[in-house]
Amino acid sequence: MAFQKVVKGTILMGGGALATVLGLSQFAHYRRKQVSLAYVEAATCFSEPVNREPPSREAQLMTLQNTSEFDILVIGGGATGCGCALDAVTRGLKTALVERNDFASGTSSRSTKLIHGGVRYLQKAITNLDVEQYRMVKEALHERANLLEIAPHLSAPLPIMLPLYKWWQLPYYWVGIKMYDLVAGSHCLKSSYVLSKSRALEHFPMLQKDKLVGAIVYYDGQHNDARMNLAIALTAARYGAATANYMEVVSLLKKTDPETGKERVSGARCKDVLTGHEFNVRAKCVINATGPFTDSVRKMDDNDVVPICQPSAGVHIVMPGYYSPENMGLLDPATSDGRVIFFLPWEKMTIAGTTDSPTDVTHHPIPSEDDINFILNEVRNYLSCDVEVRRGDVLAAWSGIRPLVTDPKSANTQSISRNHVVEVSDSGLITIAGGKWTTYRSMAEDTVNKAVKLHNLNAGPSRTVGLFLQGGKDWSPTLYIRLVQDYGLESEVAQHLAKTYGDKAFDVAKMASVTGKRWPVVGVRLVSEFPYIEAEVKYGIKEYACTAVDMISRRTRLAFLNVQAAEEALPKIVELMGRELNWSELRKQEELETATRFLYYEMGYKSRTEQLTDSTEISLLPPDIDRYKKRFHMFDEDEKGFITIVDVQRVLESINVQMDEDTLHEILCEVDLNKNGQVELHEFLQLMSAVHTGRVSGSRLAILMKTAEENLDRRVPIPVDRSCGGL
């Protein structure tokens, strides 16, 4: 053991010395660049956008169809694809982008929500003396600073705690984290620091206390990934790019080069998924930025091409916010099987993940129960035994497919690259693959540089460093106060709008419906527990939302926060969208069914029915069954064998509890398995059994019944002498 520590110490010091030398050697170079990414003056940008608002989808389709030839056509509407479109259009190139599904519908909306340089990559760079890993971390840290600056409403620094349970880990990880700060240089968000055991438990009281020796806190960035992706797409559209979601590339167009006699890619045959209409989009250069689907587009160009994408599934789960501090995350650097697990606060909930396992490429990745349970077990290992971590506490879960790649130029074709690869085919198709969210901008710059050089396009240098994304330019931390004062919004709703839409929050507020209450004046919520309002559905359509799934998962983030709340909001969302888009009753029903399937399969939603009926037996002891029957019969006064909303209202009125009818309907619907408007005794017992075993985290009806029982039991008869003699 002592020998291992000495070896580790030697490697650490040697690697640290190397990284220090490399960092110092690069310092002068970055000083000469005269661009500080952390403090860019984006207000002095080269020009204002062409459009104050993004053109409608219909207008974009007309531009795609009627333009004789674009300079660049980008296939793929994820972060990298939209980044390429923004980079190209701001250089003065005539740019188009098509996406088969919605913007950020794939990997870009299913991330860990971190903007990070990669602490674990730096660890590998030091221990393996890997210069490539070091450069990748350095680039990511500079891009992190830029992203935090250009979209301040969607991103923010986040302190992350690294709890330590062995004394030798303290100096080991402290040096490593300090190297992380050093590599960031002037773009370091805040300096890392050490916490004692007591201070660590103050910040994170649920931590496993036994053998805890202390903790190290470092800083990375966090963002709303789908909204960030959308902001990039909308910014590109405002600068003049013809961007369209739900446009599938059916085939690539080719023409013969008169000079070489070779076939060259010259555009794509595109199909509007919503209408079935097809037309050609011609371009001098076509960029393949399709993430996990990289090889499918490459095979359109050349069916014999060797695949380069090595897809890997990363599963995340969302748990209630009380599982983590409001403004501090946690990193487990070495799980039971050697992976890294993050435990992060996000949108007042807690994200835990991720896994890393080989997978097949699919449009509809499903989080497996094994991966969900793996994450739950790792969470249990790090939290105090006082905290019961239950499967029923998983409010949402998703799987994202990482597009890891092998470099086709590398002699070792089996080596997986965590960096990005820009490949050019014989026909001129440019493919950008790999990389990560944080470095989308530099990946896009490299790709467009390659396109300009290869196709001799007339373009200036990249201008996306410091270029504010939609909503970021006039945002300030106090913007929400004006929303409260000027429009009469709830403070929570106003804060949500400000950090979601930035300076465009005023446009959303103008669409907000009057509540009919004294306060708030405007802003009718979609569901009571979350600050999303009806006006966001109307505004989401202006942001190219075409389906109910777009709205619950990427315009709002309800599906990623609580699938049950998303399901509750669906009928209202479909009705609002139907009114704006003139949907027929049949289309509304189709949207409702499609969105429900999406929640059920892709967002880890075991429906309430399935949760309650996993076992045909009710696993309760006889005394418990008797107690729950007593509660049930207290509501079922007429001994009908079921309870209705009228029964619940009657009991609540008797104990002076006021609750509106809509909320009561929601509460009963949670338990009404056969959806007949009645909660029967066996349904209630199944619910209580599921709560008891932890398959569901709780029930509003169960809590309501318990409260009523306790209040009624506390009542005592009024003595005769206090009741005027009983007259």
Swiss-Prot record:
GO cellular component: mitochondrial inner membrane; mitochondrion
Positions with a binding annotation for Ca(2+): 672, 674, 676, 678, 683
Subcellular compartments: Mitochondrion
EC number: 1.1.5.3
InterPro entries attached to this UniProt entry: DAO_C, DAO_C_sf, EF-hand-dom_pair, EF_Hand_1_Ca_BS, EF_hand_dom, FAD-dep_OxRdtase, FAD/NAD-bd_sf, G3P_DH_FAD-dep
Pfam families in the record: DAO, DAO_C, EF-hand_7
Record-level GO BP terms: camera-type eye development; gluconeogenesis; glycerol catabolic process; glycerol-3-phosphate metabolic process; glycerol-3-phosphate shuttle; multicellular organism growth; NADH metabolic process
Residues of the EF-hand domain: 623-658, 659-694
PANTHER family: GLYCEROL-3-PHOSPHATE DEHYDROGENASE, GLYCEROL-3-PHOSPHATE DEHYDROGENASE, MITOCHONDRIAL
Pathway annotation from the record: Polyol metabolism; glycerol degradation via glycerol kinase pathway; glycerone phosphate from sn-glycerol 3-phosphate (anaerobic route): step 1/1
Phosphotyrosine sites (modified residues): 601
Keyword vocabulary terms for this entry: Calcium, FAD, Flavoprotein, Metal-binding, Mitochondrion, Oxidoreductase, Phosphoprotein, Repeat, Transit peptide
Sites where the protein binds FAD: 71-99
Name of this protein: Glycerol-3-phosphate dehydrogenase, mitochondrial
Class in the EC hierarchy, top level: oxidoreductase
Role this protein plays: Calcium-responsive mitochondrial glycerol-3-phosphate dehydrogenase which seems to be a key component of the pancreatic beta-cell glucose-sensing device.
